[in-house]
């Protein structure tokens, strides 16, 4: 299930970048892509919940990773919505980068992730 979770994250990040690029050009298909990205948010949460459910106990760092992961999803959504409305997104981009780095670190550090930081 870890691979499914990582795959949904990668696809969601690609869709996010494409949606931002299309939004900058004023493309008409951006709304459809945004809805598809929301579906991937649900898949990310579902696969993450499945991974968490498969564990026998919930150490504190896993709970932190869940919260930071939801923070990443929230900032992605807020960036897309505020960009569509023409509002400033600088603070949201900073939050996204910080949260993304933290969630990647926790994902690779914790036992269910890949061992880059052992």
Curated annotation (Swiss-Prot):
Disulfide bond positions: none
Signal peptide positions (record): none
Domain of life of the source: Bacteria
Cellular component terms (Gene Ontology): plasma membrane
Keywords for this protein: Cell membrane, Membrane, Transmembrane, Transmembrane helix
Annotated localization: Cell membrane
Parts of the chain that traverse the membrane: 4-24, 32-52, 60-80, 96-116
Chief location of this protein within or outside the cell: membrane
Keyword Metal-binding on entry: no
Membrane topology: Multi-pass membrane protein
Family: Belongs to the UPF0344 family.
Identification of the protein by name: UPF0344 protein Aflv_2205
